[in-house]
């Protein structure tokens, strides 16, 4: 019989972390972060990591495991997160994967086999040299020619994803979408997928308020510290919440412009997250309402209790 794994997904600022903690309390679980940026040490405010106080004694995994200058691919994330799931299950507890990084969560929950793809190190090195010497535009143009769907999802400055997409095409002859579809096999787990949504205007207000809170609690100081430690040009610093503040600190944008850009990018990201999870995964959706958040959480937990009881019978 497959072991049960729960995943809570949805857009940023919708309330996933709080539900995950309450769920872990109710069902003897532990939380595994499904956020691709929370793995980085020192990147706390901009990635909206839960604090020790907010964790309220619940064990959290996949947070603060590498430095901002270290490379951490989807395959790396999958390997580490699956080990966490095995560890939690091995101690008789319920793994609860919580986050909004769609591809990363999908890679963990399904049998993506990254090891089967042969990597041509010389080809990879050649692409890296082209970017270093000429910038990313030549490679981005090539990606638009061979895989326009993936090109629309990848920013030219995201060199790692740009190279990865071209690697897949070069070594398999498939687009990234085709490759991912081939890789998505049956899940090794009994999955319970819970999605949180919210009225768009309410969600966007929450996102704007979260950004203001990040600024008030020291995001600019956090980014300055990361720059002072030599991380400014690392891939991790291209994440939403960091690239915008870097533009301000470097003198390219006034503070209010940087904050507005951060809010706008976060809202657009939330929209992309919802699209991903609605199209890619068979999720049971629940609409959250901030004014009655406790009641909504209790409703979801009661629903889940029924599902788990039914499985055990």
From Swiss-Prot:
Residue numbers spanned by region Interaction with substrate tRNA: 35-38
Family matches, as SUPFAM superfamilies: P-loop containing nucleoside triphosphate hydrolases
GO molecular function: ATP binding; tRNA dimethylallyltransferase activity
InterPro entries attached to this UniProt entry: Dimethylallyltransferase, IPT, P-loop_NTPase
Binding site for substrate: 12-17
Site for Interaction with substrate tRNA, residues: 101
Catalysed reaction, written as an equation: adenosine(37) in tRNA + dimethylallyl diphosphate = N(6)-dimethylallyladenosine(37) in tRNA + diphosphate
Cofactor(s) this protein cannot do without: Mg(2+)
Biological-process GO terms, alphabetical: tRNA modification
EC number: 2.5.1.75
Keywords, alphabetical: ATP-binding, Magnesium, Nucleotide-binding, Transferase, tRNA processing
Enzyme class per UniProt: transferase
Residues given in the record as ATP binding sites: 10-17
Function: Catalyzes the transfer of a dimethylallyl group onto the adenine at position 37 in tRNAs that read codons beginning with uridine, leading to the formation of N6-(dimethylallyl)adenosine (i(6)A).
Subunit structure: Monomer.
Protein family (similarity comment): Belongs to the IPP transferase family.
Name by which UniProt lists this protein: tRNA dimethylallyltransferase
Source organism per UniProt: Oceanobacillus iheyensis (strain DSM 14371 / CIP 107618 / JCM 11309 / KCTC 3954 / HTE831)
Lineage per the UniProt record: Bacteria, Bacillati, Bacillota, Bacilli, Bacillales
